Amino acid sequence: MNYPHPLIAREGWPFLAGAFVISLLVHASAGFWWALPLWIITVFVLQFFRDPPRPIPSQPNAVLAPADGRIVVVEKTQDPYAGREALKISVFMNVFNVHSNRVSVDGAVEKVEYFPGKFVNADMDKASVENERNAVLIRRAADGQLVTLVQVAGLVARRILCYTKVGDNLSRGQRYGFIRFGSRVDVYLPLDARPRVTIGEKVSASSTILAELDVK
């Protein structure tokens, strides 16, 4: 299992360093009990920015979860980024989930598009169309089918980070982005994709199979 990233995401290093230094200074000057709430915050920051490696299923037609969290949508609807009817599966991440975003399928990036917007609760349906978001369209290497991944900012999460660009060749399980402090990822698939998850189910990034694609 090759995951060439630190166990604590680089995006969190400044936050962790700041929390640790402040906790240490208060501890040294005022004692443990005064510093205890700050140490608790430091531990929270540490767990929030964890970024562990995950096993990746070998099933070639599997679409993998792009994020840790809970399934809040499984429905057929319009994919506004690709202009098609699609199967939509949405993963909601709360503040206790890992917030590293990982690629669902092998393929080439056809389009990356950022949309400014609001910051309503990412658990709500309207977050998909009203909130700040970033869409990545991937053309599957195996059969040319299109998969759309959309990072959606949430009520607390106000910073979407995406590290891929048009023309990049991506692999399943590859880290491609990060969203801080609670958010959501929408996945749009071909209409004939077969969902393997249900609403309310907890999923793990790059380990849980969201759906299976028909091999063309």
From Swiss-Prot:
Alphabetical GO biological process terms: phosphatidylethanolamine biosynthetic process
Principal location: membrane
UniProt similarity note: Belongs to the phosphatidylserine decarboxylase family. PSD-A subfamily.
Cofactor note: Binds 1 pyruvoyl group covalently per subunit.
Catalytic activity entry: a 1,2-diacyl-sn-glycero-3-phospho-L-serine + H(+) = a 1,2-diacyl-sn-glycero-3-phosphoethanolamine + CO2
Free-text function comment from the UniProt entry: Catalyzes the formation of phosphatidylethanolamine (PtdEtn) from phosphatidylserine (PtdSer).
Pathway terms, separated by semicolons: Phospholipid metabolism; phosphatidylethanolamine biosynthesis; phosphatidylethanolamine from CDP-diacylglycerol: step 2/2
A GO MF term: phosphatidylserine decarboxylase activity
Keyword Metal-binding attributed: no
Assigned keywords, A-Z: Cell membrane, Decarboxylase, Lipid biosynthesis, Lipid metabolism, Lyase, Membrane, Phospholipid biosynthesis, Phospholipid metabolism, Pyruvate, Zymogen
Gene: psd
Protein name: Phosphatidylserine decarboxylase proenzyme
Pyruvic acid (Ser): residues carrying this PTM: S183
Locations listed in the record: Cell membrane
InterPro entries: PS_Dcarbxylase, PSD-A
Cofactor(s) the protein needs: pyruvate
Residues under site feature: Cleavage (non-hydrolytic): G182, S183
Processing and modification events after translation: Is synthesized initially as an inactive proenzyme. Formation of the active enzyme involves a self-maturation process in which the active site pyruvoyl group is generated from an internal serine residue via an autocatalytic post-translational modification. Two non-identical subunits are generated from the proenzyme in this reaction, and the pyruvate is formed at the N-terminus of the alpha chain, which is derived from the carboxyl end of the proenzyme.
Superkingdom of the source species: Bacteria
Record membrane topology: Peripheral membrane protein
NCBIfam families, per the entry: AS_decarb (TIGR00164), PRK05305.1-2 (NF003678), PRK05305.1-5 (NF003680)
Subunit structure: Heterodimer of a large membrane-associated beta subunit and a small pyruvoyl-containing alpha subunit.
